Amino acid sequence: MKKVFILLALKYYILNSIIRNGENLYKKIVIPTDGSDVSLEAAKHAINIAKEFDAEVYAIYVVDVSPFVGLPAEGSWELISELLKEEGQEALKKVKKMAEEWGVKIHTEMLEGVPANEIVEFAEKKKADLIVMGTTGKTGLERILLGSVAERVIKNAHCPVLVVKKPKKE
């Protein structure tokens, strides 16, 4: 009985510590997704938080135009863009299905641009309280050359960012 009381007291303390002035701290949560396993894992965390606090969820997919700027062939960009948009629709569909299964209200949106910039701008526009995203955990030269979308979002976001790291292989 004592253990049950301690667990209930702990849950009560945690819930009260993230509620301000009688309002939930998290009302709007943004989930950037690329369809990868780690982004879907991040979506699970975000949807769980949203369920707990009755928050709205915005799942977004950003068609990254930066690698294709300056392509010589005219039709190349249109073809690549269409493929990326199809990939984005699939990624958003997975997150939407997950949210609906949990009974969480979700909006999906496809954006185009530089991912970190678009994520930050979207979160600001929607007045999001939290961004939840995955990261592959790039290291070394790859990180120096390419940077980390999650790192740039953390540096520039107006709200807290929860980053879910790719699990280590066993």
UniProtKB/Swiss-Prot annotation:
Classification via CDD domains: USP-like (cd00293)
Pfam families listed in its UniProt record: Usp
Similarity-based family: Belongs to the universal stress protein A family.
PANTHER family membership: STRESS RESPONSE PROTEIN NHAX (PTHR46268), UNIVERSAL STRESS PROTEIN UP12 (PTHR46268:SF6)
Protein name per the record: Universal stress protein MJ0531
